[in-house]
Amino acid sequence: HQDGTPLSVIRADLRREVPLTELLDALPDEPIEFADRGGFETSDTDYAALVRTVIDKEIGQGEGANLVIGRKYRATVSDWGHDRALTVFRRLLERERGAYWTFCIFTGDRYLIGASPERHVSVEHGQVRMNPISGTFRLAGTATQAERKQRLLEFLADEKEIYELFMVVDEELKQMCEICHEGGLVLGPYLKPMSHLVHTEYLLAGRTREDIRQVLR
C-alpha cells in the first residue's frame, strides 16, 4: 500500500456458517460513547487544494485517470475493547444492507471493522469474479418516492458518473485479462442499494488456471 501499511493474511483455522439471528443473539450490545469525537485530519480547505493539485498535475497531465484521495477521520471511543468492537460489528450487521463483506478482525494490536460493498476479486474452483463499483447516490434528502426517483434518474444520466463507472470497469477488465486465459464477461450495469445510499456497479466473470497467490499479485 502507498501509506506503507504491511499486508496481513488471514489463515482460517475454523469456518462455520450460522444464521444471522443466532449470531446477533451471541454478540454483545454495549453502549458506545466517545472520549473524543475528533474530526477529519485534513481540513476542507487543504483537502480541496489537494484534489485540485491532483486534477491539474496528475489527471490533467495524463498520469492517472481513476484516483481516490483518502481523508482520515479520527475519534476516540471510551473503554475500547473486545465487547465494544463486537458491538460495532453487531450494529453494522443490523443496520447495513447490501454489503459484500461485513467483518470484525483483531490482529493482536488493532481491530479492523467494516461493511464493504465491493468485492475486488474472488476465485473459487477457477471461477474469477470482480465487482467494479462507482457512483454514490445518497438516499437522504428526498421527501417523496417521486422526488427520489427523479433525482436517481438525473444521477444515472450524469456524464461524470457514466464515464467514471466506465473507467473503473476498464481498469478491472485489464486486470481480468491478465489472469483469465479466456478474457472476461461483463455483466451490468446494476444498482447496488445499501442502507443510506445506492452505488452503480458491474460484475466481471472469467476463468483462470493461475494459483490464487498469483492472482493476488
Give the residues covered by each predicted segment.
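An anion-binding catalytic pocket shared by soluble metabolic enzymes
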Residues: 71-162, 178
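A short, flexible low-complexity segment enriched in Lys/Arg and Gly/Pro that occurs
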Residues: 34-45, 136-138, 143-145, 217
